[in-house]
Amino acid sequence: ESILVDLMRLALEQASESLSEAIRGESEPLEQVRLGINAHLELLVGGSDKVYVLLFEWRSLHGESRQEMIDLRDRYELLWSAMLHSLSSQGLIRADVDRDLLRLIGLGALNWVATWFNEGGRYTAKDIGDFVWTVIKDGVIKR
């Protein structure tokens, strides 16, 4: 279990660092979300087995180890919550959109890419990121 925990911890730390780095210096909240989507996807499809272990094995953990991973995951999701809150506070998200549900469904959809993405296949990570961004922009963002 300690090997799983170490791999998962590294994956979550890498995810947080990757997201923070992607949005660092960008003050426009819409652009932060777009950059965040792409950073998350790049991490997923970048060939790191740590991410797969995190996504598909975390339920194997128990007790303190499981709680530690939940806490680290929650910290990562807090970065997304802050970006969505910024959009909402600036009136950029439709009033009928639940930010928490948007975050959960959005990250779930992005994470599922790891199960079907094929390097060299029909879609690149950029294609997927652009598509996800278009869906969010056209379905969630106020015009």
Describe the predicted segments one by one.
Residues 33-36, 57, 61, 98-102, ...:
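Short, conserved alpha-helical segments within structured domains
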Residues 2-24, 31-42, 53, 71, ...:
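Alpha-helical structural segments
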Residues 68:
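Active-site Tyr-X3-Lys motif and surrounding loop/helix of classical short-chain dehydrogenase/reductase
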Residues 21-26, 62-65, 74-102, 117-120, ...:
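Hydrophobic alpha-helical bundle segments that form small-molecule/ligand-binding pockets
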Residues 45-64, 115:
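Amphipathic alpha-helical segments used for helix-helix packing
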Residues 39-42, 46, 78-90, 107-109, ...:
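C-terminal peripheral helix-coil segments that are non-catalytic and often amphipathic
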Residues 2, 10, 14, 49, ...:
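Short alpha-helical
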